[in-house]
């Protein structure tokens, strides 16, 4: 009797599991349409593991954008501060960015070596950075350009570059900062010759043809009494964004006995914030001061 019952339960269970399996198969077949195969056309764009992932953005045709929006020449501090505000937003909204560097119409964002954000898909990194940056540029425009309406929507191109070692990453950032220095020195003399000496752009270009750094410094000093080293750091060095612990003091209402109700007290707390620096990245000093950026766990 007992054996008969056990056999019956067994065959019932077997029948149920066959039905269940059929249903599941049918369900899966139904969920997959005949068009499903097009998924296979998607390319794998996973960034190589253990590499620094750098996303660099650059303003599209900003030569024209700067003209149309009356940017000051050679440097418009409103435009540079707006770029930095957008980059700060990118760092705060997205994940795993350990440092960013910007100058002119470009910003580079460095994702930590071991980031597994969106399974390290390059297209996700690039498009999320570019779209967050571009929407922030429009969103915050009025805060920096109070009297200058935004005349058309700006665009930013993006690229992803992988750097396999700390040295190559440091060299990449040094390259961008050296570019900032070379362009800024040239532009400072170029516009001084036009704005202060009345040369035409073609004449200014001719005057600077073949000149070396020392020559440009000399022209600035002897003709315009400008010591290039005293020009603002933001123009000469660009902007570095890093995470830093900042002590914040806020006045806060505290719970006290009824007779003291509503009293406020200063409360200090430490938060990690994105901080903008206009410092040198090429020498060792910066990396010694901020060892956590290249630390192994990154
Ligand atoms: N007047 C002024 N112009 C700026 C400033 N920052 C950037 N620009 C302009 O933006 C340009 C940026 O250079 P590029 O990125 O090489 O060139 P682009 O015109 O943006 O062209 P693509 O990047 O190739 O699309 C500079 O050459 C300037 O004309 C600024 O502070 N003041
Ligand atoms: Mg550009
Ligand atoms: Mg550029």
Curated annotation (Swiss-Prot):
Look up the record and give one Gene Ontology term from the biological process aspect: protein homotetramerization
- Name the coenzymes or cofactors required: Mg(2+)
Where does this protein chiefly localize? cytoplasm
Coiled-coil regions in this chain? none
Q: Which residues bind Mg(2+) 2?
A: 58, 105
Q: How is the cofactor bound?
A: Binds 2 magnesium ions per subunit.
What sort of enzyme, by top EC class, is this? transferase
User: Where does this protein hold Mg(2+) 1?
Assistant: 58-59, 105
Residues that bind GTP: 58-63, 104-105
Q: Where in the cell is it found?
A: Cytoplasm; Mitochondrion
Q: Does the keyword Transferase apply?
A: yes
Annotated GO MF terms? ATP binding; GTP binding; guanyl-nucleotide exchange factor activity; identical protein binding; magnesium ion binding; tRNA guanylyltransferase activity
- Name one cellular component (GO) term: mitochondrion
* Keyword list, A-Z: Cytoplasm, GTP-binding, Magnesium, Metal-binding, Mitochondrion, Nucleotide-binding, Nucleotidyltransferase, Transferase, tRNA processing
Q: What does this protein do?
A: Adds a GMP to the 5'-end of tRNA(His) after transcription and RNase P cleavage. This step is essential for proper recognition of the tRNA and for the fidelity of protein synthesis. Also functions as a guanyl-nucleotide exchange factor/GEF for the MFN1 and MFN2 mitofusins thereby regulating mitochondrial fusion. By regulating both mitochondrial dynamics and bioenergetic function, it contributes to cell survival following oxidative stress.
Q: Of which family is this protein a member?
A: Belongs to the tRNA(His) guanylyltransferase family.
Task: State whether it acts alone or in a complex, and with which partners, per the record.
Answer: Homotetramer. Interacts with MFN1 and MFN2; functions as a guanyl-nucleotide exchange factor/GEF for MFN2 and also probably MFN1.
Q: What is this protein called?
A: Probable tRNA(His) guanylyltransferase
Species per Swiss-Prot/TrEMBL record: Mus musculus
Name of the gene this protein is made from: Thg1l
């Amino acid at each position: 009797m007992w054996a008969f019952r056990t056999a019956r339960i067994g065959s019932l269970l077997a029948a149920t599991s066959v039905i269940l399996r059929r249903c599941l198969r049918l369900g899966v077949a139904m969920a997959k349409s005949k068009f499903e195969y097009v998924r296979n056309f998607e390319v794998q764009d996973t960034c190589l593991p253990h590499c620094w992932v750098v996303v660099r953005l650059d303003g599209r045709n900003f030569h024209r954008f700067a003209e149309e929006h009356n940017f000051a020449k050679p440097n418009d501090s409103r435009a540079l501060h707006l770029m930095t505000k957008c980059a700060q937003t990118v760092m705060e909204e997205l994940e795993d960015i350990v440092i960013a560097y910007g100058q002119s119409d470009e910003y580079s964002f460095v994702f930590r070596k071991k980031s597994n954000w969106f399974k390290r898909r390059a297209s996700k990194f690039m498009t999320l950075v570019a779209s967050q940056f571009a929407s922030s540029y429009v969103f915050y425009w009025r805060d920096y350009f109070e009297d200058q309406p935004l005349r058309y929507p700006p665009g930013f191109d993006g690229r992803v570059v992988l750097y396999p070692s700390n040295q190559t990453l440091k060299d990449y950032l040094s390259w961008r900062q050296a570019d900032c220095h070379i362009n800024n020195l040239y532009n400072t003399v170029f516009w001084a010759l036009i704005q202060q000496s009345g040369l035409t752009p073609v004449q200014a270009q001719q005057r600077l043809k073949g000149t070396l750094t020392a020559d440009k410094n000399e022209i600035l000093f002897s003709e315009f009494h400008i010591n290039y080293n005293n020009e603002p750091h933001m123009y000469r060095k660009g902007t570095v964004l890093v995470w830093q612990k900042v002590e914040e003091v806020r006045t806060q209402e505290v719970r006290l006995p009824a007779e003291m109700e509503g009293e406020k007290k200063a409360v200090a707390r430490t938060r990690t914030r994105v901080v903008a620096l206009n410092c040198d990245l090429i020498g060792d000093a910066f990396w010694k001061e901020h060892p956590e950026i290249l630390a192994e766990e990154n």
